[in-house]
């Protein structure tokens, strides 16, 4: 499971609760949309400066490579402009800001790096734009709006304006929690499992949110795979992605164009393409599904069937229905749940890795911008799980991989 956070500068519950300087990082190809985005953000209290990759290319030199194993050369990905990525990092080392919003897909603004850690599968990460000094502590809240053209950007801008108008509906208090049955974490330190093959990890995540008081704060709809009703899971997705919800939380398998919906069934972008927005307010969607936050089909050959209208995280934002933001992972990811026994009952004692990032983001979200909530979650996980830049064991390498995979895609911070 890889985490990608799509940040649209989402203001949750309280619009404009804080103000901060923002860099809108884009290209001359999308400059008109960038000016419109700047105007929208300034209306909610964020003063923005627009900087283009063309300006950065002419004015900055590339910095040193990140100290992480990876596919860092253009010989690996002919379409990956690694030199531009290093120049962007060089520019960001000079910036005094709170937010960086990337307006553009991977072809327009390249990922900050392609890391190659455990499993040896390369995955894109924007994390080194958030931490340009490479110390693994995010200096900025970074989110990407993966628009590839002015037409796509215009559609996204329309969704942002609608979302800001809809926030007064009060529907942000509605949440959908979807828990699926998935495999045990491959690098679980204690290898805690309920049986020899898999755990009810999605349901465990929902139970943990209940223990943390989430269901007391939100009006929650819960769909669990143990009900053995795939239609209830699919119907929950259909309902929430048609509007009227503030949050959708999903723990299950993922692929670049779909999320886990039942044994062998996936909720694909084709299903989402059939939806219309029917109620005010589209949700912030969080999922630990593997590769659901992939955003680099312009660079990598990501398999998409001919009937799939696009990558999950991108289509979620550019479709009329869907969501206003996505927090997820760009590649293979996983979580590790700990359990304890008390008086004959099994309790959830804690969680690590992917779901830990998502749950901490949710905990920090009420009253804060999504970018701030995600940044705070990363800081907490880095400290709590002791994420290291130079891992010496497979477990440490796995922790670093999941941490770097986390990504935010959003329309509004």
From Swiss-Prot:
Name the Gene Ontology molecular function terms of this record. Answer: cysteine-type peptidase activity
Keywords attached to this Swiss-Prot or TrEMBL record, sorted alphabetically, are: Signal
Q: Which Gene3D superfamilies match?
A: 3.40.50.1460, Gingipain r, domain 1 (3.40.50.10390)
Signal peptide coordinates: 1-20
Q: Which domain of life is it from?
A: Archaea
Q: Which SUPFAM superfamilies match?
A: Caspase-like
Q: Name one GO biological process term.
A: proteolysis
Q: What is this protein called?
A: Uncharacterized protein AF_0048
Please give the InterPro entries that the UniProt record associates with this protein.
Caspase-like_dom_sf, Gingipain, Gingipain_N_sf
């Amino acid at each position: 499971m890889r985490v990608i956070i799509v940040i649209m500068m989402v203001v949750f519950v309280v619009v404009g609760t804080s103000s901060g300087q923002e860099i809108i990082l884009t290209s001359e190809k999308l400059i008109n949309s960038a000016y419109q985005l700047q105007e929208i953000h300034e209306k909610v209290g964020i003063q923005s400066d627009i900087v283009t990759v063309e300006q950065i290319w002419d004015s900055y030199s590339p910095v040193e490579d990140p100290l992480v194993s990876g596919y860092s050369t253009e010989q690996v990905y002919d379409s990956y402009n690694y030199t531009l990525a290093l120049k962007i990092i060089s520019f960001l080392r000079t910036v005094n800001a709170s937010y960086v919003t990337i307006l553009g897909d991977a072809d327009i603004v390249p990922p900050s790096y392609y890391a190659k850690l455990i499993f040896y599968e390369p995955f894109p990460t924007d994390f080194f734009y958030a931490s340009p000094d490479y110390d693994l502590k995010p200096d900025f809240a970074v989110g990407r709006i993966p628009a590839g053209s002015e037409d796509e950007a215009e559609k996204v801008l329309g969704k942002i304006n609608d979302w800001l108008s809809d926030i007064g509906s009060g529907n942000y208090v509605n949440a959908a929690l979807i828990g699926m049955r998935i495999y045990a974490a491959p690098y679980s330190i204690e290898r805690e499992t309920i049986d020899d093959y898999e755990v009810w990890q999605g349901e465990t995540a929902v139970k943990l949110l209940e223990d943390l008081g989430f269901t007391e704060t939100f009006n929650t709809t819960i769909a669990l795979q143990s009900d053995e009703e795939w239609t209830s899971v699919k119907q929950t997705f259909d309902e929430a992605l048609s509007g009227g919800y503030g949050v959708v939380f999903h723990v299950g398998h993922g692929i670049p164009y779909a999320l886990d919906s039942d044994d062998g069934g996936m909720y694909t972008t084709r299903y989402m393409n059939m939806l219309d927005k029917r109620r005010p307010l589209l949700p912030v969607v969080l999922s630990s599904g593997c590769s659901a936050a992939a955003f680099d089909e312009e660079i990598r050959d990501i398999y998409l069937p001919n009937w799939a209208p696009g990558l999950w995280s991108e289509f979620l934002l550019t479709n009329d229905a869907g969501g206003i933001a996505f927090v997820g992972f760009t590649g293979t990811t996983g979580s590790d749940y700990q359990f304890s026994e008390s008086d004959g009952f099994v309790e959830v004692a804690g969680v690590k890795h992917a779901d830990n990032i998502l749950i901490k983001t949710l905990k920090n979200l009420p009253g804060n911008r999504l970018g701030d909530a995600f940044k705070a979650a990363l800081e907490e996980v880095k400290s709590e799980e002791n994420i290291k830049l130079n891992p010496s064991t497979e477990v440490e390498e796995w922790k670093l991989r999941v941490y770097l995979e986390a990504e935010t895609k959003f329309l509004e911070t």
